[in-house]
């Protein structure tokens, strides 16, 4: 079984109001992207989708990681599409692809392994990590039908009923 991992690190992080790319901000003295790299370092192939200040972000990527440049930052789906259509990914034969944001310093290898193992065990087409929170404002919601996953709806697209859902998308697939 072959697994690839990709870190999404192309965004500007405009809400941080900083000229430094979001993934390069330190948590406990370590850039956030380093935590993400450590979390997927055991996978067979490792990629980082870079965009905003791509040279600066690429200069921090671990030696075994492959940068893929996203020229326009058009969201998560576009970043993943950029990877899948890239020459860097062309010869990748992995059966599974794990996607994580570059700004989640608390994610660990064992959590990603559990996600992959659950996908395999359940013969699922896709898996994701979600969380139940008291205040889901600003997050994509996990919409279910009879306890079965139906879709992810972003805050800006959610109706009033969907905005009451407290199960959110972590951005980890």
Q: Which functions belong to the PLM regions below?
A:
Residues 1-18:
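N-terminal nucleotide-binding beta1-loop-alpha1 segment
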Residues 17-19, 42, 100, 164-168:
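Short glycine-enriched loop/turn motifs at secondary-structure junctions
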Residues 63, 107-173:
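Conserved core of the sugar-phosphate nucleotidyltransferase
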